[in-house]
Amino acid sequence: MVQISEVKDQVPGSSAGARTAAHTHIKGLGLDEFGAAKQVEGGFVGQVEAREACGVIVDLIKAKRMSGRAILLAGGPSTGKTALALAITQELGPKVPFCPLVGSELFSVEVKKTETLMENFRRAIGLRIKEVKEVYEGEVTELTPEEAENPLGGYGKTISHVIVGLKSAKGTKTLRLDPTIYESIQREKVSVGDVIYIESNSGAVKRVGRSDAYATEFDLEAEEYVPLPKGEVHKKKEIIQDVTLHDLDVANARPQGGQDVISMMGQLMKPKKTEITEKLRHEVNKVVAKYIDQGVAELVPGVLFIDEVNMLDIEIFTFLNRALELEIAPVVVLASNRGMTTVRGTEDVVSAHGIPPDLIDRLLIVRTLPYTQDEIRVIIEKRSKVENLQLEQAALDLLAAMGSDMSLRYALQLLTPAGILAATAGRTEILLSDIEEAKMLFLDAKRSTKILESNSNYL
């Protein structure tokens, strides 16, 4: 067969690594083995006390001694609250559920606010199900469907059984399978040379990939080549599946319909978002508790992160008080950039961070401090490296001063426009003049407010 390979055009800036988000540079909390934060580490600069406090929280979550508690990240805008929450998730790893949302997301026309919050609570609680299954695993050496006369008569024939030969590192086996499994084999598009495994109880067939013995073949379709399975063909295999409690709620709230036309048409229509009843959740919790007692499953409390918590109203705060006391609850991380302000849904209740006093009493509060000019300079320098931009020293000093006087976000947002201005002028390095030109083109919040105040009839 003729080898055909596709050569993609290399367009500068088009690679996946070139796409940068606001917190691309955050890699973790930047703590040493003793839990002490370094001044510059993991994408963070400064915020030593806040990072060390978050490190203690991560240790408590890993030890499963933190569920049902809440943390508040309190500080001004551009002090790294969202970055801290993101770093907590990266320290916990991908197996721990993390559910981020903003306070305004809880308001819906179809579903009441407390129901939406409860859904997100359940999304942040994981269940790791361990199951030992008997499987046949190996490379397919033979695949022969055997036919028989149709018992109903006529000229057609039916498949009576399927002969499948499997080979592993320690031997071979020939299996005689039920004809219903042949449909699964066809669905998975299994052919001789593929590595598959068949569950002996359910008869489920899974194609793992193509055997690496066929790696020298060339095909138009890209194949995933896998090594020959070790051990015997027939073996016991531990299968671990990670689901959330919300997945179990939805699976039981929306059972699959029948195969008739009316059921199929009902599934095609856009389903209206419905509430999951408390009774159903209670039944799911009982089944989960039974699995945990049997040692089949393990509960993994995750993290629910609510940003702009001051946007919640008094009803949600009241519900949150009760939800934190549930037997199965995640770690709740709240973030607020407000000081003394009125609690939403009330007329005269003024409280710190826009949160009622009774809920504040339950919170562990982590404070984030404003960055100094030297810290802002280091942040801008690191961010410019992430965006592949070169800054001269004078331009870096001006951006650091602007970040201190105006805001860190504004200084960081000027990096890309200044880079484009420098590239237009035929330079790879951003000069002081590029920053000044970008500053003239794009206003910051303070200058925009001054213009509006001096021209009161403008709008």
Curated annotation (Swiss-Prot):
It is found in: Nucleus. ATP binds at residues 75-82. Its EC number is 3.6.4.12. It catalyses: ATP + H2O = ADP + phosphate + H(+). It comes from the Eukaryota. GO terms for biological process: box C/D snoRNP assembly; chromatin remodeling; DNA repair; regulation of transcription by RNA polymerase II. GO terms for cellular component: Ino80 complex; NuA4 histone acetyltransferase complex; R2TP complex; Swr1 complex. It is an enzyme of class 3 (hydrolase). One of its GO terms (molecular function) is ATP binding. Belongs to the RuvB family. DNA helicase which participates in several chromatin remodeling complexes, including the SWR1 and the INO80 complexes. The SWR1 complex mediates the ATP-dependent exchange of histone H2A for the H2A variant HZT1 leading to transcriptional regulation of selected genes by chromatin remodeling. The INO80 complex remodels chromatin by shifting nucleosomes and is involved in DNA repair. Also involved in pre-rRNA processing. May form heterododecamers with RVB2. Component of the SWR1 chromatin remodeling complex, the INO80 chromatin remodeling complex, and of the R2TP complex. This is RuvB-like helicase 1.
